[in-house]
């Protein structure tokens, strides 16, 4: 497991070039932490936007099977690149950014992008170009390897004549195992990131380019972040797609064609998300996502290595990933002389633990608030006894939240509590020092919910409980409905740092009438009767009427 953790960190190995701007001079939307240039510091950065600007890349690896540290690694322009055809190569890793679909038969491309109006009509954007001319690497249709391009820009002109430009980084990450016989690409994740931008020019802007990075135990992928640190969402040499804030009330619609279907869960920075997936006979898939963007805290700060608690130091051994002043910061065994800015993962127990350890050191406050529209797949699994409910079902559900970090994978099904449990985490305060209010959305396929709970066809009822890390209830506004084969639940208005969300589903058995029978008729089974109980909390009394009434959280039966 330690090796796998190390390998995942390799994807975040970047070297920062000095940037003169300081946070106070930069609008919050363009804020991105810069790396200290003096020795002996450790920085925390929760902002995961670096992952949304990852360039297209195709790597060939020796000893590159999953869970191993590659002994050798090469950048490839295609599967036929000389260094990438060696008999020692046992795997390829790729990140393929899509361009616009050119014909109805194309896959692994963007079909359309636009904004949904109040009457549900859609204003479609115009594709302008891919940044970075030409394909970054060639695909191979026979092996299901997509072509890798640079990110694209699209324009929308309003009725008042105002033109807006958007940067789209939409694509898939995947893997080719040459030792398992098939030698064909397998899509491991799907990512779609949209951002309003304006184009600016300057010699200081450098395109994000994939690199091979030497590590203490081998090699790993990496890329430069110069343009991100300068407030750009995308870049090419001499040009920057400078980030602009979203209108949080607009609903953006993205339609993508994939050569392989999305599996599991879709999660990300989405509000009021609705996802439609259509799979064709050839196993290709059309994914349509409509959602509003969200404002997310960026938690960031530096502490001298010598002043860090031991529990924090233990998270960053020699070879840890992040952004350093140079490659020596990744290799040196003298950790007190190293300066490293960690890049938090967006999900998982490790990410939640890491942020919880840093928040007290950073006053539990965001350094900036930035807007995002991001959707990506996540592969986490349910417990063994529940996996039959999702195995082979393809797309299972949607999770949208404004939390900085959150649980990895789908909500965990607690059989004893009969609840779906999820943990989210963020700073208690926003960048202005005001309480940051949480948002959480769960769309769960109705057939999956019925399987998990053993429900019949009657309508499902749900209850959302939000409690703080110490177990006390948190005030939240919840909305629940079942429609078109989906159970949709949202919770909002709760506060952080790491609240736990529990979704409890229930279903009342439908009343049945006695069937006709010969005389004498047997006695009909009694219909379940509702009863009323009184519940108290301090001086407040509530009456609850149900077949099996229970008191709300915080109340006791009188």
Question: What residue spans do the PLM features occupy?
Answer:
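Solvent-exposed beta-hairpin/edge-strand motifs
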Residues: 102-110, 132, 454-471
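Solvent-exposed serine/threonine-rich low-complexity stretches and specific carbohydrate-binding patches
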Residues: 473-485
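A short beta-strand micro-motif
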Residues: 531-538
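Long, leucine/valine-rich, helix-dominated scaffolding and oligomerization segments
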Residues: 24-378
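Secretory targeting and sorting signals
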Residues: 1-25
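Short Cys/His-rich micro-motifs in 6-15 aa windows
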Residues: 554-558
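Proteolytic processing hotspots in large secreted/extracellular or virion-associated proteins
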Residues: 401-462
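C-terminal beta-strand-rich structural cap/linker in extracellular carbohydrate-active enzymes
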Residues: 485-515
